[in-house]
Amino acid sequence: PSSSNLPKQFNLLYVKTINEEIIILLKDIDSDSYPRLHILKYSQSLEDELKKASLDLKNGVKTIGEIDTSISNNHYGITFRKIKKNIPVK
């Protein structure tokens, strides 16, 4: 697991809750580095946010994770927003 801070923007790849921890695998959007595992302390609001994002991921909805403590209801400031698909004009 990474000991670095969460990136400002990221793609969520995987989520697993084990006991009092939530393990997430994510890819930093602003970096060419490999995806990293982060272990977060459990909270109900964080789990709810990550479950919604995981469901979107399974349903093929493109989302971006962001850190914004001003609008988030969890300790880490994690929020997700949906990205519209850009379809080229024919």
Which sequence ranges carry the predicted segments?
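Soluble periplasmic/extracytoplasmic beta-strand elements of cell-envelope proteins
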Residues: 14, 23-27
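Charged, low-complexity intrinsically disordered regulatory/assembly segments
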Residues: 17-20, 62
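Alpha-helical transmembrane signal-anchor/signal-peptide segments
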Residues: 1-18
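Hydrophobic residues embedded in beta-strands of well-ordered beta-sheets
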Residues: 20-22, 32
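Extracytosolic and intramembrane catalytic regions of membrane-associated proteins
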Residues: 27-90
